[in-house]
Amino acid sequence: MGPPKIGQTVVVEVPSTTANIGPGFDCLGAALDLSNQFTIKRIEGNAERFELIMESTEGNHLRGGPENLFYRAAQRVWRTAGIEPVALEARVKLAVPPARGLGSSATAIVAGLVGANALAGYPLPKEKLLELAIDIEGHPDNVVPSLIGGLCVTAKTASDRWRVVRCDWDKSIKAVVAIPSIRLSTSEARRVMPENIPVNDAVINLGALTLLLQGLRTGNEDLITDGMHDKLHEPYRWGLIKGGLEVREAAKAAGALGCAISGAGPSILALCKATKGREVSVAMVKAWEAAGVASRAPLMSLQLTGSECISNTFG
């Protein structure tokens, strides 16, 4: 079979994500309304050629080539669909900063899957793309909401299948995400976690996750506050984030219902009513400034559509 004849250039938008949201370690994540845009183009050359063009200084350290996450994801689509690969160029308008706990790696994986699938004429269903995304990333909490949008719980069943459930999020609840200038890699954040956890800590998290999901569904402030409590990963990770605990306490004092490390960090998520958004944002930025860390703290909403192919040029 020759190269795909349908697509020449596709433009894909992929949202950022906040994962874990406190007690939902490696299973809970939400898509947010901050997105990366990927313009993906077939180019001349052998199938191993991949050119990456970053339209942001934040991504200057990222490189093309066979180890790039986008490239690996695109290749998985070709192989799975039985299609001969083609050389690609990806031009990225980067709005989601890397190594900040906002799912930047997930956006690359999802863009590679969705873009390659679109170029090939959509041979794979979204369910298969979900499976591939989780396999490449290694955990589902970022890639799943990045692909399908919304607030998602992803669990592995007794039959070793992934099951995804989209949960309700009351519109009155907003997310303030304090994004610092410092970086923290996911691998570093995972290294500090213990291999085993006490049963009591697991029980606390199970209860907290139930409270949080019910609070987000109904907009119940007390349930959100009681539910944003974690024993599995945050106690080990706060020490990696300079000024993080002070930022958390400042957000709560300003009216946040609860705070959590966003993904692996170092960004910090605060949930609040929309009327408290500005106060919480200002408080978090000031607290980080006092610790000698520059930051910004935009007020964000849930992104419901997930990744979208907004343009497909046929050639």
Curated annotation (Swiss-Prot):
**Subcellular localization(s) per the UniProt record:** Cytoplasm
Q: Which Pfam families does the record cross-reference, listed alphabetically?
A: GHMP_kinases_C, GHMP_kinases_N
Q: In which pathway does it act?
A: Amino-acid biosynthesis; L-threonine biosynthesis; L-threonine from L-aspartate: step 4/5
Q: Which PROSITE patterns match?
A: GHMP_KINASES_ATP
Main location per the UniProt record? cytoplasm
Tell me which residues bind ATP.
97-107
MF terms from GO for this chain are: ATP binding; homoserine kinase activity
Question: Transmembrane ranges?
Answer: none
Q: Could you tell me the EC number(s) of this protein?
A: 2.7.1.39
As its record notes, the protein acts as a catalyst of: L-homoserine + ATP = O-phospho-L-homoserine + ADP + H(+)
Entries under SUPFAM superfamilies matching the protein: GHMP Kinase, C-terminal domain, Ribosomal protein S5 domain 2-like
Organism superkingdom: Bacteria
Q: Keyword set for this entry?
A: Amino-acid biosynthesis, ATP-binding, Cytoplasm, Kinase, Nucleotide-binding, Threonine biosynthesis, Transferase
Which Gene Ontology biological process is one annotated for this entry? Answer: threonine biosynthetic process
Give the GO cellular component terms, alphabetically: cytoplasm
Q: Which PANTHER family did the record assign?
A: HOMOSERINE KINASE, HOMOSERINE/4-DIPHOSPHOCYTIDYL-2-C-METHYL-D-ERYTHRITOL KINASE
The record's function comment reads: Catalyzes the ATP-dependent phosphorylation of L-homoserine to L-homoserine phosphate.
Regarding protein family, the annotation reads:
Belongs to the GHMP kinase family. Homoserine kinase subfamily.
Protein name, as recorded:
Homoserine kinase
Q: Which organism is it from?
A: Prochlorococcus marinus (strain NATL2A)
Q: What is the lineage of its organism?
A: Bacteria, Bacillati, Cyanobacteriota, Cyanophyceae, Synechococcales
